[in-house]
Curated annotation (Swiss-Prot):
The keyword Cell membrane applies. The gene is PLA2R1. Residues 1-23 form the signal peptide. It comes from the Eukaryota. This is Secretory phospholipase A2 receptor.
């Protein structure tokens, strides 16, 4: 019986639901569950609901819902059943088996699902289906639609899981893992169980008892009102702050975390608030995120909580260049000018802020939009109880101020978006582009104030603003006309200016609107509070003449204020006139007379517009004013009505498309108002991030491409298709993004084009850190991280001439098509003339080598030949009647001859070939005849720089290794007496006719690393610290691999001012316990004890090597105690798995840098991508190895390469990419799995007032690394917690300590070590000898140091340093894990429920399970390989003996024959 239970647990077998019928739930209870994201899945066609049974899932009547029908989307795209306490799983080895519930961390079934347009989709494109009328299965054959029972929208996707970020604990702020197992129970939400203080907490891995990673959760009961125990209150301002200094999140993650706690990222409104924050974090050497950001591409810097930005304390190093990627703000309390900008993807601690008397920022003060009829003097414009006058004489700011004062007015102050709208209209009517406004600063730090003394309650900064001019005592502000945005301007410049003064307010009766209607501009508005369907509301009867249409952000803000006055329900909605009238997915305005009008502005909520065929309503709250698609027939809402102030006949105006042709080589088609240009990697210097690409387009006066309607998307798709090989996965940035934190998570176009269709599938809902979209040539958009680098497409209005940037090198209008460029000459000439012209342009007359190329050429010459013409191609007879050959020497592998034409062989003249623009067929003609022709080139004109010239292969001496065009010697002598310092290594290489190696690519780095397998001795390479940007051979450093990545020149911290600096030289690490494998770091050049790598140029003088005779890669390879098998066949990922199994292997898993490097070299030689065993079922959020291996090692191409599909391949540089599993690749890599060792350290950590992380048999607290304490104070703190200061006893422990504090980023510099340095030796204060030390570049000489020195560890360099014992720095506590401790809960508060009998029973059970597991393990080792987990990802390093690679796979036949 015990054996059966254990096997079921290990297999992750289907969970059995509780015996007996589950209690029925009332409709009210079901609706309550829905508020928590828990729903019932109903078949749309069969009207029955999915219920978890004892062994299978079935369809049952929905009339008596019970807990076994309740589902919830949880972490990793899992679907969790509340009653069955298990996750929906698909057995991939037998997909036809009915679906069941499994342990939620099972590795033997697929647990990941996606909801997409009423379908639930798993791996292999299997969707949830119904079999035999009520059995739930997964199949790829049919499509079954599912809806949410008793839900207004019926959308099963609306409750998709959103990460819940933790605070405190020991997880550095990482999100909760739901469900997580604690005390033998799966929790799908935060719990108070085990907490004496009743706080909500969660685990951040699936099993708390195994990993002990946890943190506190936001408390929903206190998020809305007040400041509970997790906030610190400023009694003077009644503002609360939350200091998350142990967390390490990206900006967007920190933004989400603050919102979940009912607050927002920190905004700083004045110097007093900044001083308060500085005082609170004064003891922490930490840089933190604030809410400052520049993520709205159409605006400037802003606070994420909407607070006006009028106080500034920028660091002098801040850059306002458009190409700089730092768009998120930080605060550093240790600096007087404390504000900096950072890359938003960096991970940092953060501070949240919450107002006690908080009012929703989007509920605008209604009075700002209320219409007041106002009377003014002649020449002054009335608006909202004030009078305004644009003075059309240019003056400096101070002159303008005094001029207004002289007319009893002031320079205009602007307090709302309503007033911005008025100013834009005023400037537009007067044809003025810019004006002074009354905002200025005369202080430092900068604090902008209105000249009339009114408070700054609103700001509207322009892109890259406010820019601060150094050494300026006064800063002044102007406003531009197009959007009313502000910018900081030199006060001595001259501009028009606007004066403002109070007017005479008239009665409400003079507004021009009927009673009950509100006026804005030339229209009157009213809310019909009766709930109606869209068809009734839009009929014109209840809302004459029509529902509201919204033209711009100003009208939207007015509508929002109007709604706020009547909203008293949580879920109130208001119909507007927007509808997908033709069910095409494109939304248009439905106006009076049932006519359609195009959309000029949109204001969608997150994940909207979700579907086609719907009608649009405005949300009344949370967030107010946002648009959502609703069912036109069944959904009921109030109505927003709109009518003109004066009845006037609407002018029917014909919309005229501009007919101006596109300038230069921009492209369009008839009927489109814009021109497009594709910037792909063949034509530009580099791929770029989204913001860099947008700035690149702006240099031309353009923006990243948008799609105003389906015709534009179709054109862009047609533009891409012929350019690139269809097997290529090309991705291009377009303007679609949701970067702006004030935009409620909705997507928008960077050029302001309205979003009139649903461009993203429901697949991507909930993934809120991929904020920018790329376009793929299969008409799909894919969200990616904005910091990843891609190609891009720009768009510009057809009648706007593109600007020519100074760096742009214009090329003739060559057309790119699949790795070649073509220049079409429609003017006729003889064949030899074109041979000369094409040659002069470094090209050849056209060659055609495929049907695709033929199709491309024919399409172009048809368009260029109005009446039909023949065009020369590059086939020519060498002599009369000779065989035709391509002039560029390439073989004739494709032909398309006209077989009807007579081919006489009696011609006296030399003939050349042509192609007909009518038929596309080829024929011959005398070369002297005049025809148009086409040039073709393979070497591209790069608009930013030209390419390098090719090199030649040669031979290498015996014992040296071939790599690319180099010979490499990897020398790690077995005898330590032959190890060398850097100078000796350099001289040795010189004597051999070479130099120390210059590593110039990732593949070369991998080649060297793979040849160091089994070594623990690092090797010298050709760099020195006095010129680390140039290799010893004189080449610039184009590739680098420093450890850590942002540190190049590490100083010697144990060197005093009296000692001369040590010259430093670069080593490549093959000892992962001190530096990560393959990484570079600096060491004392004179220190002996290292190997080295030499390089020299291959000898091409004797005879050139034909690389085609290099040894082919064998199908079976041995490396590093592993056996690999290479499968060469065109196959999908699934076929690759089966093929590996047929060869007695598994699709490869890669767990360390050595084996990754080996495979990188192999893939580089093979020349094409291969499948590996990594896959995902949740759009790239989490990945698993198909052989069950657990490893944290990754090698992605970039941060977004994991989001492109469900299955993974390695490219020819070894980097990993995900793609569609059904894609065909030319091969796969298999391996014969090795046995893994069982988990060896089951002990638990005791509970104290600080959190602990376990490694092997010790526990560590990293919560104190940001504290500042002397050595003695730190020692006493740890002692009170029943622990000691940190000691480092072996290499594995040192490796663990290198990795774990990386989560704190640059915030952690040094921590104390529990040791003393006496008589040139280190002694641990716990009495154990210090066998392990790491002084780095130089061991300290005590003669040069003051007394009372203590030992510290520098993070992240990992070296030891002497520091005065009284110095304040961070520290880490360490204690032994205790198997006798029974953990009742994480965090604060010791457990007092330890019962000796329970301890004894626990030991007996553990021993029984270990004995039984060992027995089963012996019976089936292959099965247990799949069960190996990663409870602790740090294992003792195996001391491999040096592996002698008898024949390196890159040695050529020539060397073998020497």
């Amino acid at each position: 019986m015990l054996l059966s239970l254990l096997l079921l647990l290990l297999l992750g077998a289907p969970r059995r639901c509780t015996e007996g019928a589950a209690a029925a739930l009332s409709p009210e209870r079901v609706l309550k569950w829905q508020e928590k994201g828990i729903f019932i899945i109903q078949s749309e066609s069969l009207k029955s609901c999915i219920q978890a049974g004892k062994s299978v899932l079935t369809l049952e009547s929905c009339k008596q819902p019970n807990k076994n029908m309740l589902w919830k989307w949880v972490s990793n795209q899992h679907l969790f059943n509340i009653g069955g306490s298990g996750c929906l799983g698909l057995n991939l080895s037998n997909p036809e088996q009915p679906l069941g519930l499994y342990e939620c961390d099972s590795t033997h079934v697929s647990l990941r699902w996606r909801c997409n347009r009423k379908m639930i989709t798993g791996p292999l494109q299997h969707t949830v289906q119904v079999k035999q009328d009520n059995i739930i299965v997964a199949s790829g054959k049919r499509l079954h639609k599912w809806i949410s029972y008793m839900s207004d929208s019926g959308d099963i996707c609306q409750h998709v899981h959103k990460d819940l970020y933790t605070r405190k604990g020991n997880a550095h702020g990482t999100p909760c893992m739901f469900p997580f197992q604690y005390n033998h129970q799966w929790h799908h939400e935060c719990t108070r169980e085990g907490r004496q203080d009743d706080s909500l907490w969660c685990a951040t891995t699936s099993r708390y008892e195994r990993d002990e990673k946890w943190g506190f959760c936001p408390d929903p009961t206190s998020a809305e009102v007040g400041c509970d125990a997790v906030w610190e209150k400023d009694l003077n301002s009644h503002i609360c702050y939350q200091f998350n200094l142990l967390s390490s999140l990206s900006w967007s993650e920190a933004h989400s975390s603050c919102q979940m706690h009912g607050g927002a990222l920190l905004s700083i409104v004045d110097e007093a608030e900044e001083n308060f924050i500085r005082k609170q974090v004064s003891g922490e050497a930490v840089e933190v995120w604030t809410g400052l950001n520049q993520l709205d591409v159409n605006a400037g810097w802003q606070w994420s909580d909407g607070t006006p930005l009028s106080y500034l304390n920028w660091s002098p190093e801040i850059s306002f260049e458009p190409f700089v990627e730092y768009h998120c703000g930080t605060f550093n309390s240790f600096m007087p000018r404390a504000w900096r900008s950072r890359n938003c993807e960096s991970t940092l601690p953060y501070i949240c802020k919450k107002y006690l008397n908080h009012v929703d920022d989007e509920i605008v003060e209604k009075d700002a939009w209320k219409y007041y009829a106002t009377d003014c003097e002649p020449g002054w414009a009335p608006y909202h109880r004030n009078c305004y006058k644009l003075q059309k004489e240019e003056k400096t700011w101070n002159e303008a101020l005094h001029s207004c004062l002289s007319s009893n007015s002031t320079l205009i102050d602007i307090g709302s978006l309503a007033e911005v709208e008025f100013l834009v209209t005023l400037l537009g009517n007067e044809n003025a582009s810019e004006t002074w406004i009354g905002l200025s600063s005369n202080t430092f730090p900068v604090s902008f104030e209105w000249s009339n003394g009114s408070s700054v309650i609103f700001t509207n900064w322009h892109t890259l603003e406010p820019q601060i001019f150094p050494n300026r005592s006064q800063l002044c502000v102007s406003a531009e006309q197009s959007e009313g945005h502000w910018k900081v301007t030199d006060c001595e410049e001259t501009h028009f200016y606007v004066c403002k003064k109070p007017g005479h307010v008239l009665s409400d009766a003079e507004s021009g609107c009927q009673e009950g209607w509100e006026r804005h501009g030339g229209f009157c508005y009213k809310i019909d509070t009766v709930l109606r369907s869209f068809d009734h509301a839009s009929s014109g009867y209840y809302c004459p003449p029509a529902l509201v249409t919204i033209a711009d952000r100003f009208e939207q803000a007015f509508i929002t204020s109007l709604i706020s006055s009547v909203v008293n329900m949580k879920d109130s909605y208001f119909w507007i006139a927007l509808q997908d009238q033709n069910d095409t997915g494109e939304y248009t305005w439905k106006t009076a007379g049932q006519k359609s009008e195009p959309v000029q502005y949109t204001h969608w909520n997150a994940h909207q517009p979700r579907s086609s065929g719907g009608c649009v309503a405005i949300r009344g709250r949370n967030p107010i004013g946002r648009w959502e698609v609703k069912d036109c027939v069944h959904f009921k809402a109030m109505s927003l009505c709109k009518q003109p102030v004066e009845t006037r006949e609407k002018m029917e105006h014909e919309e005229r498309w501009p007919f101006h042709p596109c300038y230069l080589d921009w492209e369009s088609q008839p009927g489109l108002a814009s021109c497009f240009k594709v910037f792909h990697s063949e034509k530009v210097l580099m791929k770029r991030t989204w913001r860099e690409a947008e700035a690149f387009c702006e240099e031309f006066g353009a923006h990243l491409a948008s799609f105003a309607h389906i015709e534009e998307e179709n054109f862009v798709n047609e533009l891409l298709h012929p350019k690139f090989n269809r097997s290529e996965e090309r991705q291009f940035w377009i303007g679609f993004n949701k970067r702006n934190p004030l935009n409620a998570g909705s997507w928008e176009w960077s050029d302001g084009t309205p979003v009139i269709s649903s461009f993203l599938d429901n697949n991507y809902f909930g993934e809120d850190t991929r904020n920018c979209a790329v376009y793929k040539a299969n008409k799909t958009l894919l969200p990616l991280h904005c910091g990843s680098k891609r190609e891009w497409i720009c768009k510009i209005p057809r009648d706007v001439r593109p600007k020519i940037p100074s760096w742009y090198q214009y090329d003739a209008p060559w057309l790119f098509h699949q790795d070649a460029e073509y220049l079409f000459y429609p003017h006729s000439s003889e064949w030899s003339s074109f041979e000369f012209v094409c040659g002069w342009l470094r090209s050849d007359i056209l060659t055609i080598h495929s049907a695709h190329e033929q199709e491309f050429i024919l399409s172009k010459i048809k368009a260029l030949s109005k009446y039909g013409a023949n065009w020369w191609i590059g086939l020519q007879e060498e002599t009369a009647n000779d065989e035709l050959r391509w002039r560029d020497g390439t073989p004739v592998i494709y032909q398309n001859w006209d077989k009807e034409r007579d081919r006489s062989m009696n011609n006296q003249s030399q003939r050349c070939a042509f192609i007909s623009s009518i038929t596309g067929l080829w024929d011959r003609e005398e070369c002297s005849v005049s025809m148009p022709s086409i040039c073709k080139r393979k070497t591209f004109w790069v608009i930013e720089k030209e390419k390098d010239t090719p090199k030649q292969h040669g031979t290498c001496p015996k014992g040296w290794l071939y790599f690319d065009y180099k010979c490499l010697l990897v020398n790690v002598p077995k005898d330590p007496s032959n190890w060398k310092n850097w100078t000796q290594a350099r001289d040795f290489c010189f004597d051999e006719g070479g130099t120390l190696v210059a590593i110039e690519s990732e593949v070369e780095q991998a080649f060297i690393t793979m040849n160091l397998f089994g070594q623990t001795t690092n090797v010298w390479i050709g760099l020195q610290n006095d010129d680390y940007e140039k290799w010893l051979n004189g080449n610039p450093v184009a590739y680098s691999n420093w450890s850590p990545s942002d540190i190049i020149n590490i100083p010697s911290y144990n060197t005093t001012a009296d000692q001369k600096p040590i010259p430093l030289c670069a080593l490549l690490s093959s000892n992962p316990n001190f530096h990560f494998t393959g990484k570079w770091y600096f060491e004392d050049c004179g220190k002996e004890g290292y190997g080295f790598v030499c390089e020299k140029i291959q000898d091409s003088a004797g005879h050139e090597v034909n690389t085609s005779i290099m040894d082919p890669i064998p199908n079976t390879l041995e490396y590093g105690n592993r056996t690999y098998k290479i499968i060469n066949a065109n196959m999908t990922w699934y076929a690759a798995i089966k093929s590996c199994q047929l060869h007695g292997a598994e699709l490869v898993s890669i767990t360390d840098q050595y084996h990754q490097s080996f495979l990188t070299v192999i893939l580089s030689r093979l020349g094409h991508a291969h499948w590996i065993g990594l896959f995902t079922a949740d759009n790239g959020l989490h990945f698993d190895w198909s052989d069950g291996t657990k490893s944290s090692f990754t090698f992605w191409k970039d941060e977004d390469s994991s989001f492109l599909g469900d299955c993974v391949f390695a490219d020819t540089s070894g980097r990993w990419h995900s793609t569609a599993c059904e894609s065909f690749l030319q091969g796969a890599i298999c391996h014969v799995p090795t046995e893994t060792r069982p988990f060896e350290h089951p002990e638990l950590c005791s509970e104290t007032s600080i959190p602990w992380i376990k490694f092997k048999s010790n526990c560590y607290s990293f919560s104190t690394v940001l504290h500042s304490a002397s050595f003695e104070a730190a020692h006493e703190f740890c002692k009170k917690e029943g622990s000691n200061l940190l000691t480092i006893k072996d290499e594995a422990e040192n490796s663990f300590l290198l990795e774990e504090p990386f989560a704190f980023g640059a915030s952690v510099q040094m921590v104390w070590l529990n040791a003393q340095f006496d008589n040139e030796t280190v002694k641990w204060l716990d009495g154990t000898p210090a066998d392990q030390s790491n002084w780095g570049i130089r061991k300290p000489d005590m003669a040069h140091f003051e007394p009372h020195q203590c030992l510290a560890l520098r993070i992240p360099e990992g070296v030891w340093q002497l520091s005065p014992c009284q110095k304040n720095m961070g520290f880490i506590c360490k204690m032994k894990a205790d198997i006798h401790t029974v953990k009742e809960h994480p965090g604060k508060g010791p457990s007092h429920s330890i019962v000796p009998l329970a301890v004894a029973l626990t030991l007996v059970v553990i021993l029984a399970i270990i004995t039984l597991s060992f027995y089963i393990y012996k019976q089936n080792k292959g099965f247990f390989r799949r069960l190996a987990g990663v409870g602790n990802s740090y294992y003792p390093t195996t001391n491999f003996s040096t592996i002698h690679l008898e024949e390196n796979i890159l040695i050529s036949d020539l060397e073998k024959n020497d």
